[in-house]
């Protein structure tokens, strides 16, 4: 049975503010930086997020496996009692060169080129199309849920909502065909 095209209400939540200080001090790079926990401000943001009325309308809570998203999701799970699923494929957008400078340059190129990767690009990164495919393939297993809270990352969320800037712990509701 072909099940493509089922609409699921996704309540996107960007993770709280992370604290990279300890990892940067120890020269962590790439996915090593994804071990960063929330900052004190990020924890306050996550606690405030738990008061959002939309969260209680969901059937399931899904989180990226990145520490900052998972820590944010832990607050939501405790406050709402929603079952939590962790998805490693809902990670942050990938830039294939190390360093914050390269990340910011890649982000500028990504935005300038509407998510495409030009053949002569000086930095390699995951395209918008690749991110969408990764997301949809990962989320296919949740088609039987009407409403899912998804704690994830700005660049991934931006592929489905028009906001260019998505604040920490911002809640954005949308229907997505999965």
Sequence positions of predicted segments:
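Short, well-ordered beta-to-alpha junction loops that form the rim of enzyme active sites
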Residues: 63-67, 89, 151-155
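Residues at the C-termini of beta-strands that transition into short coil/loop
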Residues: 14, 88-90, 175-178
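Short aromatic-enriched loop/helix-cap "lid" or pocket-rim segments at secondary-structure transitions
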Residues: 21-26, 73, 96-100, 162-164
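Short, Lys/Arg-enriched N-terminal segments with co-localized hydrophobic residues
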Residues: 1-7
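Phosphate-handling substructures
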Residues: 22-23, 32-37, 78-134
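Active-site-proximal alpha-helix that buttresses catalytic centers in soluble enzyme cores
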Residues: 9-85, 172
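Active-site-adjacent alpha-helix immediately C-terminal to a catalytic or transition-state-stabilizing loop
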Residues: 70, 133-178
């Amino acid at each position: 049975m072909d099940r493509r095209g089922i609409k699921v209400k996704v309540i996107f939540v960007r993770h709280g503010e992370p604290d990279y200080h300890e990892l940067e001090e120890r020269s962590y790079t790439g996915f090593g930086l994804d071990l960063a926990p929330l900052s004190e401000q990020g924890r306050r943001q996550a606690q405030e997020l738990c008061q959002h009325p939309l969260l209680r309308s969901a059937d399931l809570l899904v989180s990226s496996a990145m520490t900052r998203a998972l820590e944010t999701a832990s607050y939501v799970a405790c406050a709402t009692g929603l079952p939590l699923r962790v998805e490693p494929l809902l990670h942050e957008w990938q830039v294939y060169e190390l360093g914050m400078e390269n990340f910011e340059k890649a982000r500028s190129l990504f935005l300038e080129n509407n998510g495409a990767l030009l053949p002569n690009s000086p930095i390699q990164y995951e395209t918008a199309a690749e991110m969408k495919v990764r997301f949809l393939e990962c989320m296919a297993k949740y088609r039987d849920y009407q409403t899912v809270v998804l704690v994830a990352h700005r660049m991934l969320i931006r592929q489905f909502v028009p906001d260019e800037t998505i604040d920490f712990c911002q809640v954005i509701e949308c229907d997505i065909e999965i």
